[in-house]
Amino acid sequence: MHASVITHLRCPVCAGPLTAAGRALRCAAGHSFDIARQGYVDLTAGRSVHTGDSAEMVTAREALLEAGHFDVVSDAVAAAAAGVPGAGLIVEVGAGTGRYLARALGPDRVGLAVDVSKAALRRAARADPRIGAVRADVWQGLPVRDAAADVILDIFAPRSGPEFARVLRPGGVAVVVTPAPGHLAELVAALGMVGVDPAKPERLAASLRPWLTQVDEVPLRATLALDRAAAAALVGMGPSAWHTDPAAVTATLAGMPEPITATLEVRLSTWRSGG
């Protein structure tokens, strides 16, 4: 793990600073956390957490993102991060494969990929040499020192207003991407995917506004032209994977002419820490 990332980490047990000690991270109180051979560190400290995305979901997401279908999102996220002054740390919560984080680093920053999925962290740890990957649950507290981050990325991921405010430095910014009600509407109708809660914008504001100040919100929209494999990956990479039958999805897609079109429709909002 990159030394400059470790300097921003804190012990999940006692909140003391972590330092490298061979193939482990340790604090002064003696708490020790092994670095897995795949490059990530489990900092859940034995607490029970959700297992997160399965290996199949991560593979599907990696294929879809690498094909460039969500580049309109990654480009906008990278631009928003680049607009925040500083040459320090970017933290991505729910980082998945680390692709968004790697594209947002720019020339001068290091990144921390946080996820609960071990399958995702194996990918994130390899996404860029400047990225460190840790297993942690945002609801149980991020293993990051106070005021350590220039930017937090949260892309289709859980959020914690109090933790974001604690981890961001004064003037730091959280970049949040959430689906709009029309996101992938064509596939939702055809394949039984999970739809978007119309009240999602209100819930987002309620989760962040007491702790951060909203700076901006911009809509992002693109028409995706997918082959059947990409459409299946789109279903299989997110929450719909838990609610659909892969065989039924494959059968439905077999009867749909290519390219299969779907509308990517999301909102990107930025939230500043007042410090």
Question: For the regions a protein language model found, what residue spans apply to each?
Answer:
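N-terminal auxiliary segments of SAM/dcSAM-dependent transferases
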Residues: M1-T51
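Conserved Class I S-adenosyl-L-methionine
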Residues: I6, V218-G275
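Class I SAM-dependent methyltransferase Rossmann-like catalytic core
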Residues: G46, H50-A76
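Conserved class I S-adenosyl-L-methionine
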Residues: G86-G96, V173-A205
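Conserved SAM-binding loop of SAM-dependent methyltransferases across substrates and taxa
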Residues: T97-D108
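Conserved SAM/SAH-binding beta-strand->alpha-helix loop
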Residues: D115-A119
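A short glycine-rich, Lys/Arg-flanked "PGG" loop and its adjoining helix->strand segment in the class I
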Residues: G161-V175
